[in-house]
UniProtKB/Swiss-Prot annotation:
This is DNA-directed RNA polymerase subunit omega. InterPro entries: DNA-dir_RNA_pol_omega, Pol_omega/Rpo6/RPB6, RPB6/omega-like_sf. Promotes RNA polymerase assembly. Latches the N- and C-terminal regions of the beta' subunit thereby facilitating its interaction with the beta and alpha subunits. One of its GO terms (cellular component) is cytosolic DNA-directed RNA polymerase complex. The gene is rpoZ. It comes from Geobacter sulfurreducens (strain ATCC 51573 / DSM 12127 / PCA). Keywords: DNA-directed RNA polymerase, Nucleotidyltransferase, Transcription, Transferase.
Length: 69
């Protein structure tokens, strides 16, 4: 995959807003020192790495129910 697009990631995440949240959380983990879950031989930025991980199905999410007020 030479270029990552939102459409590549939306195959794994149904909602683009959820995709933004998932990618941003993964970027924070990478900045804090987490190892990439994909091969990163190039000098890719953490945002690109996180999107590639999501598109490859290496990063997922679980929705929890909201608390009632």
């Amino acid at each position: 995959m030479a270029r990552v697009t939102v459409e590549d990631c939306l195959d794994k995440v149904d909602n683009r807003f959820l995709l933004v949240m998932l990618a941003s959380k993964r970027v924070k983990q990478l900045y804090k020192g987490a190892r990439p879950l994909i091969d990163n031989r190039g000098a890719n930025k953490n945002v690109v790495i996180s999107l590639r991980e999501i598109a490859a199905g290496k990063v997922g999410y679980e929705l929890t129910s909201r608390r009632s007020r």
